[in-house]
From Swiss-Prot:
Needed co-factor(s): Mg(2+)
UniProt-recorded name of the protein: Dermonecrotic toxin LvSicTox-alphaIC1bi
Similarity remark: Belongs to the arthropod phospholipase D family. Class II subfamily.
Tissue distribution: Expressed by the venom gland.
Disulphide bond pairs: 45-51, 47-189
Protein's organism: Loxosceles variegata (Recluse spider)
Reaction(s) the record says it catalyses: an N-(acyl)-sphingosylphosphocholine = an N-(acyl)-sphingosyl-1,3-cyclic phosphate + choline; an N-(acyl)-sphingosylphosphoethanolamine = an N-(acyl)-sphingosyl-1,3-cyclic phosphate + ethanolamine; a 1-acyl-sn-glycero-3-phosphocholine = a 1-acyl-sn-glycero-2,3-cyclic phosphate + choline; a 1-acyl-sn-glycero-3-phosphoethanolamine = a 1-acyl-sn-glycero-2,3-cyclic phosphate + ethanolamine
Enzyme class, first EC level, given as a word: lyase
InterPro entries xref list: PLC-like_Pdiesterase_TIM-brl (IPR017946)
GO term, biological process aspect, one: killing of cells of another organism
Enzyme Commission identifier(s): 4.6.1.-
Location relative to the cell: Secreted
Details of cofactor binding: Binds 1 Mg(2+) ion per subunit.
Keyword annotations: Cytolysis, Dermonecrotic toxin, Disulfide bond, Hemolysis, Lipid degradation, Lipid metabolism, Lyase, Magnesium, Metal-binding, Secreted, Toxin
Length: 272
């Protein structure tokens, strides 16, 4: 999965898909009442990027629905969306409410109330383990609204670079048993080692681990891309999807990796 980083403006959806992304990451900021408000990152952000691009969340999600509905030229090119949920602005007790409001919003504006809505898989990426009730609030709301089937399209990620054991315990608290992606990384302005990504991959490949897929961010340089692939990740989040595509075509990688398609299930652990 080639995950276009910080796609917060409607025009950028096309831009990143055209460069080779089959997945995008979008930042979601919340208002004081825990409603998803903007797709916005703000400063500081990755080196070389404009941190201030934004849309109203509803407008972005409607455009995303259009892009990921059969008949659209992007439909079979873009099939995974990571919502990077900026819950740091919320009180801990608002996490469940944020999940409820996010679910209602996506149900209406993305899934079109279950009537021929967008088809991409969605990952809810949460920066704080304490906010795990966002997941339970989200799940319960879709069930209450009569659309539990949409949870088949939803996965989860804790993005705070916490200890993998703590992450696993938090999923147990939330009652999550699958659809788990694990991120690891740091802004492209800095370097980060591979210790934790290796631990995440080990959990993914172990008999009793909860992780299904592992991705690393933000990977922009050619050598870092190679090092990341050598760590056996499932996804690379990048500002330059065309560089990831280029490296995947190198002799060392083209037989070992392939770019995911719409037919690939992002919740299934890949077994060699």
């Amino acid at each position: 999965w080639i995950m276009g980083h910080m796609v917060n403006n409607i025009k950028q959806i096309d831009e990143f898909v055209n460069l080779g992304s089959n997945a995008i990451e979008t930042d979601v900021s919340f208002d004081k009442k825990a409603n998803p408000e903007y797709t916005y990152h703000g400063t500081p952000c990755d080196c070389g990027r404009d941190c201030l691009r934004w849309e109203y969340f509803n407008d972005f999600v409607k455009a995303l629905r259009t892009a990921t509905t059969p008949g659209n030229s992007k439909y079979d090119k873009l099939f995974l969306v990571v919502f990077d949920l900026k819950t740091g602005s919320l009180y801990d007790y608002q996490a469940s409410e944020a999940g409820t409001k996010l679910a209602k919003n996506l149900l209406q504006h993305y899934w079109n109330n279950g009537n021929n809505g967008g088809r991409a898989y969605i990952i809810l990426s949460i920066p704080n383990l304490k906010h795990y009730k966002l997941i339970t609030g989200f799940q319960q709301t879709l069930k209450d609204e009569g659309h539990a089937e949409l949870l088949d399209k939803v996965g989860y990620d804790f993005s705070g670079n916490d200890d993998i054991g703590d992450v696993q315990k938090t999923y147990e608290k939330a009652g999550v048993t699958g659809h788990v992606w694990q991120s690891d990384g740091i802004t492209n302005c800095l370097l980060r080692g591979f210790t934790r990504i290796n631990a995440a991959v080990a959990n993914r490949d172990s008999a009793n681990g909860i992780i299904n897929k592992v991705y690393y961010w933000t990977v922009d340089k050619r050598q870092t891309t190679r090092d990341t692939l050598d760590a056996n990740v499932d996804g690379i989040m990048t500002n330059y999807p065309d560089i990831t595509v280029e490296i995947l075509n190198e002799d060392a990688y083209k037989t070992k990796f392939r770019i995911a398609t719409y037919e690939d299930n992002p919740w299934e652990t890949f077994k060699e």
